Amino acid sequence: MRTHYCGNLNKSLAGQTVELCGWVNRRRDLGGLIFIDMRDREGIVQVVVDPDMKDVFEVASQLRNEFCIKFTGEVRVRPDSQVNKDMATGEVELLATGLEIINRSAALPLDFNQTNSEEQRLKYRYIDLRRPEMSDRIKLRARASSFVRRFLDENLFLDIETPVLTKATPEGARDYLVPSRVHKGSFYALPQSPQLFKQLLMMSGFDRYYQIVKCFRDEDLRADRQPEFTQIDIETSFMTSQEVRNVTERLVHDMWKELLDVELGQFPVMPFSEAMRRFGSDKPDLRNPLELVDVADLVKDVDFKVFSGPANDEKGRVAVIRVPGGASLSRKQIDEYGNFVGIYGAKGLAWMKVNDRAAGFEGVQSPVAKFLNEEVVNAILERTQAETGDIILFGADKAGIVSEAMGALRLKLGTDLELTDTSAWAPLWVVDFPMFEEDGEGNLHAMHHPFTSPLGVSAEELQANPAVANSDAYDMVINGYEVGGGSVRIHNAEMQTAVFGILGIEAKEQQEKFGFLLEALKYGTPPHAGLAFGLDRLAMLLCGTENIRDVIAFPKTTAAACLLTDAPSLANPASLEELAIAVKLAEKKDA
C-alpha cells in the first residue's frame, strides 16, 4: 500500500512520486490550501493539498485528527524561507495527487496537546502509543532487544527456550499459579525466572545460553516493577564471576554506545559493605556526591542516649550526611526531612548547622550541641570536612534502619537541592554480598537465591558460620537502578544440600521441591555462572524516563490490573468446575 514512511522523506527523493500511509496528526487551512501533518511510526511530514486537485481537495476537507489515510504525491523541496527546522522532514513536503480515507476516527478520548491521566492513557493505550514520544520509546526498546541478540549471537551464546508452565520454587516473591485440568488439585507456577532450567542447560552441555524471556512475580508493585516483566537471561559454563562481568559489561557498554552514542567507560567495582557504609544502599547512585559518614566512635561516650545507645550497640549505627550549603535550610524544611526518614523507621533527624567553621564549637547551631562537648563537635566537623554554610544531618538507630533511612534521605537531598548530576551516567558493579540475611525472628534467608555459591568456603565452613559468609554474587547498577544481577552457582550436591539445610529446608522438603536438581548435580555438573538483566529497566534508562510503564507496550497498573482489557476478571463457572476449583470471594462490608 505504501512506498515510504512519512518520517523518511528527504531531499534525495525530490521529484519522485511516493505513497504514504498513516494518520492525520494535524490539519490546517491556510491561503486556500489544506496542509496535513501526516504521521506514521517513523515521524511526520507535511502534505500540501492544492484546490486545483478538486477530488483530492474535497476529500481532504473532510479529514480530522487520527483519520487513517493514504496519500499519493510528489516530493518537493521547500523554499529556504519555509524550511521547518523542528521537523526531521522539514526540508521537504508532499504535493498531494491522490488521497484515500482508509478509516475515520471518532472523537478522541485523549488529547495529544495536553497531559492526560495515566489511567486514561492505559485504558486507551493503542491511541497513547501513537504519540511520537511513546512510539520512540517502544522503538528504542526494540532496538535494544535486537542489539542484545546480535551481541550474544556473535559471542557464541545460544538462544534456548525454557518452560513457562513449571514447578513452584522459593525465589523470594509469590508465584502466579495455573491450575491443571488433567491433574486436578495440582498447580503449575509461572516462572519468576528460568533459574533452574538454565542451570540444567549448563549440565546438558550448552555452555553459553541466553533468552529474552517473560517472567512473573506476584509482588507489591513500584514505578520500576511489573507483575510480568522481561528478562535478558544469561548463563555460562567454565567462566569465573569476573569473566561473566567482563562480557556483560561489554554488552551494556556497547549498547549505550550504539543506541545513545554514550561512552560509559570502565565500570568501577564496589563491595557490598562499602556501598552500604558510604551510601546506605546496595544500588548507589554515584551521580550524587553526598555520602554517609560513620561517627559512632566519636559519640559513644556522650551523655545523649539517642547517640550513645546505638553507638555502643553492635547492631547499631550512627551516621551523618554533610550537605554543602545546607545551612540555608529552614526549620520547616528540616522537619519535613525528619518526617521523610520516619517513613523508613527512623525516630527523628538531628542536625547541626555550620555557621562559622573557623569558630569550631562556637560556630555551630544545633539543638543537640548542648549534649556534645567541644572535642566531639570538632571531631565530627573534621571527619565530615564540613565548611561554613554546611549542615550535618544525623541518623542513629539499628544499622539497617540508619542505612535505609539515610540512604533514602541522601537521594532526596540530591534531587531537592539539585546536587545529583542528571546529565551523567554512573554505572558500577556491587560485589561480595552476604550469603544470607536475617529476618526479624533470627532466621536466615538467601540474600539472592538458594542456588548462589558461597565465596571461598567449603560446605563444612559454611555450616559452621553461615551468618558471616559472602556469596560469589554481583549486581550491575546504573544511576541508582539495579539493572542486572547474577552469581556463580552451586555445582555440587553437597554444597547445595548444606545451603538448603541452613535455610531450614529439611531433607524431605528438599527432595519434594528440588529432587530433580539434586539428582542432576550428581552427574558431572560443570562450574557455571550467569546474570539476568531487566530489559524493562534498561529500556527505561535508555529512554530517560523514571516509570517502567513508559517502555512497555501494554503495562499493568500498580494494582496489577490491565485497564485496557479489564484483566483480571472472574472466570466462567463452567471452567472453574472443570478445574475442580471453588472461588471464595471476600465479603463486602456494609458502609
Swiss-Prot record:
Broad EC category: ligase
Instruction: Give the GO biological process terms.
Output: aspartyl-tRNA aminoacylation
Name a GO molecular-function annotation: nucleic acid binding
Q: Which reaction does it catalyse?
A: tRNA(Asp) + L-aspartate + ATP = L-aspartyl-tRNA(Asp) + AMP + diphosphate
Which annotated residues bind L-aspartate? Answer: 171, 217, 448, 489
| The enzyme's E.C. designation | 6.1.1.12
What domain of life does the UniProt record list for this protein's source?
Answer: Bacteria
**Which InterPro entries does the entry mention?**
Aa-tRNA-synt_II (IPR004364), aa-tRNA-synth_II (IPR006195), aa-tRNA-synth_II/BPL/LPL (IPR045864), Asp-tRNA-ligase_1 (IPR004524), Asp-tRNA-ligase_1_N (IPR047089), Asp/Asn-tRNA-synth_IIb (IPR002312), AspRS_core (IPR047090), GAD-like_sf (IPR004115)
Subunit record text:
Homodimer.
Q: Which HAMAP family match?
A: Asp_tRNA_synth_type1
What is the protein name given in its UniProt record? Aspartate--tRNA ligase
- The organism of origin for this protein: Aliivibrio fischeri (strain ATCC 700601 / ES114) (Vibrio fischeri)
